[in-house]
Amino acid sequence: MYLVESKGGAIACMLLALLSLGTWPAVLTLLERRGRLPQHTYLDYSITNLLAAIIIAFTFGQIGSTKPDSPNFITQLAQDNWPSVMFAMAGGIVLSLGNLSTQYAWALVGLSVTEVITSSITVVIGSTLNYFLDDKINKAEILFPGVACFLIAVCLGSAVHRSNADDNKAKLRDFETAKQEASGPSTEIGTNSSKDLETNVTTKPKEGTARFLIELENTRAIKVFGKRKIIGLAITFFAGLCFSLFSPAFNLATNDQWNRLKQGVPKLVVYTAFFYFSVSCFIIALILNVVFLYYPVLGLPKSSFKAYLNDWNGRYWAFLAGFLCGFGNGLQFMGGQAAGYAAADSVQALPLVSTFWGVVLFGEYRRSSRKTYLLLFCMLFMFISAVAVLMASSGHRK
């Protein structure tokens, strides 16, 4: 079994996890904006997310010889370690609930702000719990100022969402006024939205304009016009609460701080715990998304399992997202085993990556107000500061 034994190796795992975990949300957002039902996408994503855990378990988990206190993956499957297994599976359940929630929050709140708020809540609650579970191996005088920065980022993220929503309402209102002045009687938003008002020639709308927002609304799967701002924020905060619990649960699974294992039974190695973690994550995702096929939420159209099986539009992108998330989580846990899970939560800086994709790929916050830009800058500044502080707090597990 391969173990990360150095602080440098742990930080390398965190950085690779950061890149992976910051990219897969952008892939799912792209599919939703192209009109693919989120239920279909999440089912595909869940398959490769589980497959990534299996690959990690049978490679890194089987490298080297078995030791009494660090058995290989297959050896540990037959051991009486169910108390730790249940903690790992509980972590997988809350992670799956969080990921499923964010898929809807990305549409309602935006990729950048959703990731900022959920990641900040994860650090504020999760890193605090991990600090005590890890016997305080992280430096408190460094860790908790970083946690405070993340807490401020939560407030700033909520303010960014409200300000940007107000900007979009103003754009749509001005666009409707311009249409009335140019063509007389009002027409329903969305009709001929991609045509120039003067020349009536079809043009591609510029990112951030009212026409861009209208065209996006017409093509995307989750409709956002008319939805209350509080709905998206409520889903986002629920997801953040779920995310804040999965890392402490995994910590308990691998380190048995509450002494639930029988005398002589070795603790779960990170690869075995990650396997059980991913199995429960897959099961809950499968159950909920099959239910959502027939009983959709947020006004989505009904589907069926047969329709899902026949929907190959964007399936390979969803598979890619699952691999990115699976390997990202695996790397996070490998790093956390060495440097402490409170420091490994620094991968919750993934909004820095997601914001890059949100701005570059999706044109988020284009042509927004100065107030929105100022709030966005302050939010990201707090994130950069908090991540640096959180990584500096990392200790080394004895």
UniProtKB/Swiss-Prot annotation:
Q: In which tissues is it expressed?
A: Expressed in root xylem, cotyledons and leaves. Expressed in leaf blades, petioles, trichomes, stems, flower stigma, the upper part of pedicels, sepals, and the top and bottom parts of carpels in siliques.
User: Where, by residue number, does the polypeptide cross the bilayer?
Assistant: 11-31, 45-65, 82-102, 105-125, 140-160, 230-250, 273-293, 316-336, 342-362, 372-392
Instruction: Quote the biased-composition stretches of kind Polar residues, using this chain's numbering.
Output: 183-200
Disulfide bond annotation, renumbered to this chain? none
Keyword terms, alphabetized: ATP-binding, Membrane, Nucleotide-binding, Transmembrane, Transmembrane helix, Transport
What is the annotated localization of this protein? Membrane
Residues binding ATP are: 221-228
Q: How does it sit in the membrane?
A: Multi-pass membrane protein
Q: Which GO terms describe its biological process?
A: allantoin transport; pyrimidine nucleobase salvage; uracil transport
InterPro entries from the entry?
UPS_plant, Ureide_permease
Q: Which GO terms describe its cellular component?
A: membrane
Protein name listed in UniProt? Ureide permease 2
Q: Which domain of life is it from?
A: Eukaryota
Q: What does this protein do?
A: Proton-coupled transporter that transports a wide spectrum of oxo derivatives of heterocyclic nitrogen compounds, including allantoin, uric acid and xanthine, but not adenine. Mediates high affinity transport of uracil and 5-fluorouracil (a toxic uracil analog). Mediates transport of free pyrimidines and may function during early seedling development in salvage pathways, by the utilization of pyrimidines from seed storage tissue.
**Which ranges does the record list as Extracellular topological domains?**
1-10, 66-81, 126-139, 251-272, 337-341, 393-398
**What Pfam families does this protein's entry cite?**
Ureide_permease (PF07168)
Ranges for region Disordered = 176-200
